[in-house]
Amino acid sequence: MTYLEIEGTNHLSGNVAISGAKNAALPLIVSSILVKNEVKINNVPNVADIKTLISLLENLGAKVNFQNNNALLNTNTLNQTIAKYDIVRKMRASILTLGPLLARFGHCEVSLPGGCAIGQRPIDLHLLALEKMGANIQIKQGYVVASGNLKGNEILFDKITVTGSENIIMAAALAKGKTKLLNVAKEPEVVQLCEVLKDAGLEIKGIGTDELEIYGTDGELLEFKEFSVIPDRIEAGTYLCAGAITNSKITLDKVNATHLSAVLAKLHQMGFETLITEDSITLLPAKEIKPVEIMTSEHPGFPTDMQAQFMALALKANGTSIIDERLFENRFMHVSELLRMGADIKLNGHIATIVGGKELNAADVMATDLRASSALILAALAAKGTSKVHRIYHLDRGYENLEEKFKGLGVKITRLEE
């Protein structure tokens, strides 16, 4: 098992280039199932989750060439509609293949998913929506077994669901007739999926709102143009927090600040200033790091995927911060590890109270999920001494070239074998 050794530091400086968004690339790669031509996708991050998804598509018969952050996908050779447990267990997003496979072939089997151990994350919203579109769904021996010809319908999501929205948008693309989706997720990653489908000729109205109308092609495959994945707003937010926790000036390149409005607003409340251009954000040090109150919610609210990083940052604030996690239960697993470093954090259900301004000390800590592991790295940057972060396979699922990027900012960080 590998781990990261990180030396605490008072200062970062320099530029960091932000990679393509993993959470945008995953549904975009899956959407190639809806397509008759070879698809070229640029700015695809080279992270473990992407490699898992590519191996799943290859297992279904697709031809994929992935190098230099560019993916060439040909799904004309698909000869399988069973997404096997061996691959799906590694990553929850594999469930995204359910809608497109069913829409294209009229039947499929997808193993119930694995991935981050955060809460229950049920997929029943996906299944209920597909049933409303005429699918016959059964759960057999750990697999979702789906069949039927999909027809458009009006579907209201009881809860906002990002992967659920993406799954049903893709299913509706090849369904017969109009599908109206209500309470759709508005995340930038969902918006890009809709825009790519629209560029391919699909009639889709309401992009960027919580109501979509999709006029399905009744089984006729789409033709995609070449496109690039949007920048990763969560990676960008993580590096902004790295600059903030060391109260340093750093610049993010290849970033879209409009996707980070809620994160930037909280940094400004904490006393930091930013200089923003069309594709860069420069973070300027704060005279005093102030405490903050955060409540996670769906986009355009504060993203749950940035909650752990801001908890680490709040440890440096002069006062008491409150974080209210509204989206997932069991998403405070990083707290016990931060306590090992001297953090003063109290939990009451889904609310965390963080008393800042206390010295952090280096420690051996263990990552529990993707975003929690980035919080531990941030805390290690602010701690006195050299910390070791274990189970970093979580980080490799979502952060591209993490050590190289941190080294470029002046961090002493080394990957070692246990």
UniProtKB/Swiss-Prot annotation:
Active site: 116
GO MF terms held by the record: UDP-N-acetylglucosamine 1-carboxyvinyltransferase activity
Binding residue positions for UDP-N-acetyl-alpha-D-glucosamine: 92, 121-125, 305, 327
Localization terms from the record: Cytoplasm
Residues modified as 2-(S-cysteinyl)pyruvic acid O-phosphothioketal: 116
Principal place of residence: cytoplasm
Pathway membership, UniProt: Cell wall biogenesis; peptidoglycan biosynthesis
NCBIfam families documented for this protein: murA, PRK09369.1
HAMAP family according to UniProt: MurA
Name of the protein: UDP-N-acetylglucosamine 1-carboxyvinyltransferase
Source species of the chain: Campylobacter jejuni subsp. doylei (strain ATCC BAA-1458 / RM4099 / 269.97)
Designated gene of the protein: murA
